A protein has these predicted regions:
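Metal-cofactor-binding active-site regions of metalloenzymes
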Residues: 2-123
Length: 125
């Protein structure tokens, strides 16, 4: 009688590994492209900046619609909104802190974050 050796299923194949638990590197990440939607709403209300929706869900939908690559003009409207709420030291500090918190929550161990100081020239930080 012969026996058949079954494949070892105890160790997962590389495709079965849960990527969420692996350490990550984030290269060329834009600070003004990673704001939390709720933060955009909070900061816009505090600063009197007009937003295209008044709920987190509505604004998230607007952002997704404009960031889908349909047109550069629509895409850049998102950045016009996010940079509009990054015009004070306090706003910038909150955005940067939350950005790093989100990277950590995603398992990022090294991040290269980019931002455009010239976009903050509305009030000369």
């Amino acid at each position: 009688m012969t026996t058949t050796q079954l494949p070892d299923t105890a160790s997962p194949s590389p495709l079965e590994v849960d990527l969420a638990v692996l350490p990550k590197v984030s290269l060329h990440d834009h600070l003004d492209g990673g704001l939390r939607v709720g933060t955009v709403l909070d900061l816009a209300r505090e600063a009197g900046v007009d937003v295209p929706a008044d709920t987190v869900e509505g604004l998230a939908e607007w952002i997704a619609e404009h960031a889908n690559g349909e047109s550069l003009e629509k895409y850049l409207q998102v950045f016009a909104l996010t940079t509009a709420v990054m015009q004070t030291r306090e706003q910038l500090r909150r955005v940067a802190r939350e950005f790093v918190e989100d990277l950590v929550a995603d398992g990022v161990v090294y991040g290269e974050i980019r931002w455009a100081p010239e976009q903050l020239s509305l009030i000369h930080i």
